[in-house]
Design a protein with these regions (language model features):
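Metallo-beta-lactamase
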Residues: 42-44, 62-74, 101-157, 161-233
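Conserved beta-strand hairpin/beta-sheet module of binuclear metal-dependent hydrolase folds
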Residues: 2-56, 166-178, 182
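Active-site/pore-lining binding-face segments in mid-to-C-terminal subdomains
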Residues: 207, 212-273
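C-terminal regulatory/interaction regions
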Residues: 251, 255-321
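Residue-level marker for buried hydrophobic side chains located in beta-strands
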Residues: 36, 67, 91, 173-175, ...
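Metal-dependent catalytic neighborhoods of phosphoester/phosphodiester hydrolases
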Residues: 77-86, 104
């Protein structure tokens, strides 16, 4: 099972084996005068990144830039650990996320509260990054990594307030993190394309997500590079599915939230409903109900999505009176 995939002559993706599963989360390697990595996943994935860089014959001291789209732990939890191995690298991050990379105390506390005894296996260690090695980027900022390759940063909230997307001039592609959803690429071998919104708590904002999608759409890119997982050139289908699934998720959540006062019960009901809706959609397209994707990823992700939607609706106070 290969851990590296060549996407273009100057772009690779390393499989981070997030949750010990292939094609879950990836780290992108952009070649140029200043070698650049986008996304770090969590610290248990850093050895996979280091092995991938070694396989690509990239010296760790040659890496100049490490970019995270946002500071959720499956995208940036390993940044501190990775940077201890890359002495010449600078971390690029949204202004709202920078302080958590410099002092990850709140990230650690939050993760331990959610994951308990599983924290060490999933995320440990989360290491601080010296402030002088952190560079804040925002809307319209650019980073030239080669004479023919400039990265442009865009503020793309919706999944998180501190989310950036990165346009790559060389490939006319954009690294979107979780802004326009998750790509279940392993289903393509069945002839199925599935892109689902990621509505995780606590900063999910559907209107902002759709506005960010429109911002990305306006760039007329040829390719979208997902945090989860890999590249899609069928960009119009990405946008279409986000526009389809996001209202489905929200309306399902609203119906449950209006009648269920207990938030834990509402979360569970919504997670089950979302799972059943997506599973039904996939079985109609020939994906067997025994496929490992259902048990290992979809159930987990629909639970996280449900929590984000219920939290959003709670903030709106659209619940029972």
């Amino acid at each position: 099972m290969g851990s590296i995939e060549k996407l273009s002559s100057q772009l690779y993706i390393i499989d981070d084996y997030d949750f010990q599963r292939a094609q879950r989360t990836g780290t992108y390697v952009l070649l140029g005068d200043d070698i650049t990595l986008i996304e770090t996943c969590a610290s248990p994935s850093v050895p996979h990144i280091l092995n991938g860089l070694k396989e690509l014959n990239i010296a760790l001291d040659a890496i100049r830039n490490i970019i995270v789209t946002h500071v959720h732990l499956d995208h940036a939890g390993g940044a501190g650990f990775l940077m201890t191995n890359c002495p010449n690298a600078t971390l690029f991050v949204h202004s709202r996320g920078a302080r958590h990379m410099i002092d990850p105390t709140k990230l650690i506390q939050g993760a331990k509260a959610v994951y308990g005894e599983s924290f060490d296996k999933l995320y440990n260690p989360i290491l601080p990054i010296p402030a002088e090695r952190v560079c804040i980027v925002g809307e319209g900022d650019t980073l030239e990594i080669a004479a023919n390759r400039t990265l442009t940063f865009y503020d793309t909230p919706g999944h998180a307030k501190h989310h950036i997307s990165i346009y790559d001039s060389l490939t006319n592609g954009i690294f979107t993190g979780d802004t326009v959803g998750i790509y279940y690429r392993e289903l393509t071998k069945y002839g199925v394309e599935l892109y689902l919104p990621s509505t995780s708590p606590t900063q999910f904002q559907p209107d902002a997500m759709l506005e960010s999608k429109e911002r990305i759409k306006s760039l007329n890119v040829d390719c979208i590079y997902f945090g989860h997982y890999g590249a899609s050139t069928n960009v119009s289908e990405v946008y279409r599915q986000l526009e389809f699934w996001l209202p489905v998720f929200l309306e399902t959540g609203k119906e449950i939230f209006k009648t269920e006062e207990d938030l834990v019960t509402a979360n569970n009901k919504l997670a089950n409903s979302l799972f059943e809706i997506v599973q039904s959609h996939l079985t109609q397209q020939g994906i067997p109900t025994t496929h490992s994707l259902y048990e290992y990823m979809l159930k987990l992700e629909m639970d996280v999505n449900a929590k984000g939607i219920i939290h959003y609706l709670t903030q709106l106070k659209v619940g029972p009176v």
